[in-house]
């Protein structure tokens, strides 16, 4: 009988990527088949996030539910991974003895061995080490699911912002070799992927080894990815302002595949708060980066992260943030009330901002950015937008839906053969969470760039053993 696997994922796109790799890995090694129903699973995995407050409480609440399933089925294996697992380690098992496997973001590739250990010895296993970039050497070949795909290019962060747990839970920055990344993307392109999103905690710090022992910069990697035929849209998430260098901005000038949309976290518009956060840049320096970007790509839209109510934030500090929001005219944002993370320097700072004040400031900020997003959407009416068709519309199965470069969902009338391809549409109406378009031209009528076929990239970056058999090692 087929064994079933259920994965619950919380957190960032890196976690989503990791969960997809876990599913592929366990399907290839143990034959596990994914299920959305925890009750029918033989293996339950929780991929956790520790960015927000009460992350641990959420974990133990869900584990309490899974414990009941294990009481009914003693053979059920429960595993916890991700950043909470990395933070808590053995203490997690002390609070939740029902957990059999505890693994970190850098040890998910060892899941098959850990599961074998549990099955063979009936004893738990904990591995939350940081074995460099080893996990990518032991994951199965990528499997496309639709026209878009995430590809991890690096792990960890060296910035040690005072509010952030990432350096402690995912380790310091480690870049994948550039050939490994290109090989994975070429394989995805050969399966029909048209858009890739390059992932990392700080992608613009990427410095990957090349086959000849040189170093590939992030700007060089962007151009190499964009040159793969079929990959006609490139995104990346997420960046840090202090390493958003001019060579990256130059890619926006000469590489049309790189989208006119950038998520560049700033966190605050107050230099005093930025210093307390150890962000290593000022609001003015952030604005200078955006000014250069708009010179290189006038139609680029910017999104950001904001933390409201950081310890000691005054009304003046908040007003400086709101001024930055207006000056940059952000399209969207991920904004949250500050929550102290255990073990971070900011957790020890005196917090004299009331919860009511924090909530009010967050509401004001989110309302303003929502207004700006609607203004941008309304200005798109009458323009022609290139849309990657992702499938049928959720509003009407007789229509299609896709996304613009600035992540707007567009619904329009079209035929099923357009799914997975690009179309140009004229925007004719704006709604709260989507746009309405009229089809103007299909991909056959476009002049998309061609440079190097996926097969050529695969051949160029392929690794082989001593008898000439290809070994996939991204």
From Swiss-Prot:
What PROSITE patterns does this protein's entry cite? MTTASE_N, MTTASE_RADICAL, RADICAL_SAM, TRAM
Q: Which cofactor does it need?
A: [4Fe-4S] cluster
Task: Provide the organism lineage as a comma list.
Answer: Bacteria, Pseudomonadati, Pseudomonadota, Gammaproteobacteria, Enterobacterales
Cite the MTTase N-terminal domain residue spans from the record: 3-120
Specify which residues bind [4Fe-4S] cluster 1 according to the UniProt entry for this protein: 12, 49, 83
Described function: Catalyzes the methylthiolation of N6-(dimethylallyl)adenosine (i(6)A), leading to the formation of 2-methylthio-N6-(dimethylallyl)adenosine (ms(2)i(6)A) at position 37 in tRNAs that read codons beginning with uridine.
| EC annotation from Swiss-Prot or TrEMBL | 2.8.4.3
**What are the UniProt keywords, alphabetically?**
4Fe-4S, Cytoplasm, Iron, Iron-sulfur, Metal-binding, S-adenosyl-L-methionine, Transferase, tRNA processing
Q: Which GO terms describe its cellular component?
A: cytosol
UniProt name for this protein:
tRNA-2-methylthio-N(6)-dimethylallyladenosine synthase
Gene3D superfamilies linked: Methylthiotransferase, N-terminal domain, tm_1862 like domain
* Residues of the TRAM domain: 378-441
């Amino acid at each position: 009988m087929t064994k079933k696997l259920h994965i619950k994922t919380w957190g960032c796109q890196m976690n989503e990527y990791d969960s997809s790799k876990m599913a592929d890995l366990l399907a290839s090694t143990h034959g596990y088949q994914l299920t959305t129903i925890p009750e029918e699973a033989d293996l339950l995995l929780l991929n956790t996030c520790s960015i927000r407050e009460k992350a641990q409480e959420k974990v133990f609440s869900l584990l309490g539910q899974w414990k009941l399933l294990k009481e009914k089925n003693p053979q059920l294996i429960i595993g916890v991974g991700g950043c909470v697992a990395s933070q808590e380690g053995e203490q997690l098992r002390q609070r939740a003895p029902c957990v059999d496997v505890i693994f970190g973001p850098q040890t998910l590739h060892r899941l098959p061995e850990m599961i074998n250990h549990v099955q063979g010895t009936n004893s738990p296993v904990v591995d939350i080490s940081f074995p460099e970039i080893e996990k990518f050497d032991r994951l199965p070949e990528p499997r496309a699911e639709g026209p878009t795909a995430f590809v991890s290019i690096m792990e960890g962060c060296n910035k040690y912002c005072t509010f952030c747990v990432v350096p402690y839970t995912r380790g310091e920055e480690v870049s994948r070799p550039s050939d490994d990344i290109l090989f994975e993307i070429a394989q995805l392109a050969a399966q029909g992927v048209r858009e890739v999103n390059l992932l990392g905690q700080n992608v613009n710090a990427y410095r990957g080894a090349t086959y000849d022992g040189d170093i590939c910069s992030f700007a060089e990697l962007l151009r190499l990815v964009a040159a793969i035929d079929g990959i006609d849209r490139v995104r990346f998430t997420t960046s840090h302002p202090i390493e958003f260098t001019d060579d990256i901005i130059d890619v926006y000038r000469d590489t049309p595949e790189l989208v006119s949309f950038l998520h560049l976290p700033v966190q605050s518009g107050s230099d005093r708060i930025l210093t307390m956060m150890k962000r290593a840049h000022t609001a003015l320096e952030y604005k200078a980066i955006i000014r250069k970007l708009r010179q290189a790509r006038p139609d680029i839209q910017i999104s950001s992260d904001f933390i409201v109510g950081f310890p000691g934030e005054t009304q003046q500090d908040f007003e400086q943030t709101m001024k930055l929001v207006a000056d940059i005219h952000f399209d969207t944002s991920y904004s949250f009330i500050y929550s102290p993370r255990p073990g971070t320097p900011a957790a020890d700072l005196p917090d004299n901002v009331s919860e009511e004040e924090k909530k009010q400031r967050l509401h004001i900020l989110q309302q303003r950015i929502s207004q700006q997003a609607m203004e941008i959407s309304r200005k798109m009416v009458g323009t022609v937008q290139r849309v990657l068709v992702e499938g049928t519309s959720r509003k009407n199965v007789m229509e299609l839906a896709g996304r613009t470069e600035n992540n707007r969902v567009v619904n329009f009338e079209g035929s099923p053969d357009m799914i997975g391809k690009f179309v140009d549409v004229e925007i004719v109406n704006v709604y709260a969470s989507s746009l309405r378009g009229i089809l103007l031209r299909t991909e056959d009528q476009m002049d998309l760039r061609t440079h190097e076929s996926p097969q050529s990239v695969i051949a160029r970056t392929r690794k082989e053993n001593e008898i000439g058999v290809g070994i996939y090692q991204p």
